[in-house]
Design a protein with these regions (language model features):
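Ubiquitin-like/PB1-type beta-grasp interaction modules and other compact soluble beta-rich domains
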Residues: 1-89
Length: 89
């Protein structure tokens, strides 16, 4: 099935994963690191390298609802990563 991964500050990508996949399985798929500009790694690996872990990357949503790594996705789902806001006024 196809699932889209979108980070608010990046171009979305679409990946092919097995039915009943979890968010963690989707973000572990080869090439998903492209969301962070790292085509050679999975998004989980790229987040670990760049931010020290996925939890430092931001908030996860699936089709607009709050999600965890164990949330199941369905055909056509969109995983949205809302980056943490850094700095301030």
């Amino acid at each position: 099935m196809k699932v889209e991964i979108y980070r608010l500050s990046a171009e979305p990508i679409t990946v092919e994963v097995e039915e009943e996949a979890t968010v963690k399985q989707v973000l572990s798929a080869p090439g998903t690191g492209a969301v962070l500009g790292d085509d050679e790694h999975s998004l989980l690996e790229a987040a670990e390298r760049r931010y020290g872990g996925l939890d430092q990357l931001g908030t996860l949503r699936v089709n607009g609802a709050a999600a965890t790594l164990e949330t199941r996705v369905t055909e056509g789902s969109t995983i949205l990563i809302i980056p943490k806001v850094e700095g301030g006024c």
